[in-house]
């Protein structure tokens, strides 16, 4: 997660976040945040931000690693920790995550400017590219562990 984070906290975060319910219920968070900005609904925005922050701690660790989203979260941790990669960059597959993050910033800007089509395009690009990035990581992770 980052420098200075106690290992026990980091392990707890990743083990709980790897529950597929944690991963899949976070996927729409970006869209809800963009919607809240578009509607200028600060309560919804606050709730979505709190949800995004606490979500990984709300679910127990998964019983198995069979679910795709479980492997996606484990692959992300493996990619960053064991392979010493970053989550963004210009090389493949990190470019997917980088452009996806820029798509999310674009979506927020479009929402603020009250442009729903552009905001939707940004959200779809952001989520699609994040899932693409995860798909690539899962493929590498499955080869390594399989």
Listing of model-derived features with the role each one plays in the protein:
Residues 1-146:
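Short amphipathic, positively biased membrane-proximal segments
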